[in-house]
Amino acid sequence: TATSRGTFELNGVSESELEPAIEAVQAAKLRLGGTGATVRAVVACKGTDCRKGMFDVHAFACRLDKEFYGIDVPKKFKIGVFGCLNSLGKAMAQDIGVMPSFTEPGKFEIYIGGLLGNRPVQGKHIPVPLKEEMVADAIRYVLDIYKTNGIYPQRLRTVLDDKKELWQEINYYFKSLAK
């Protein structure tokens, strides 16, 4: 089954077929994971190939995916990279959504704590435009806060709303990166 994050789920594999299925996946040079309390596959809009795309969305998303995919966290964690204002809603629906800055060309703005599902919540905009090379540091910092303060089954947004001082810590850290 294909998932909304561009991964596949193998359903109905019996225990006796599990090892050969894993070997087949590895032989095809595909990776295992994408479920449980981990950072999920980083999603991207079609921005690289879109006439409104403002940067190479796919290359940036791939770099972030290589660094963060599969990291253990208290509950699932979703990162998305989007290329223009048309994807603002998608950026706000991620644990971390990354978009180009519309006030400082060549920089990026981040939305944190978005949720979908039966209780959707818009991610909060962190109003500190960051250079591309600082975005991974910002994500790493947020993940560290989540891993340090969260416990299963809390999502990032719950952790941040329960300990409001963490929002301020994130803002201070982002400002230090932007200097």
Where are these regions (language model features)?
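Catalytic cores of large soluble enzymes that bind and process phosphate-bearing ligands
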Residues: 13-14, 49-56, 127-134, 148, ...
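Mobile "lid/hinge" segments at catalytic clefts and subdomain interfaces of large enzymes
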Residues: 83, 87, 92-155, 169
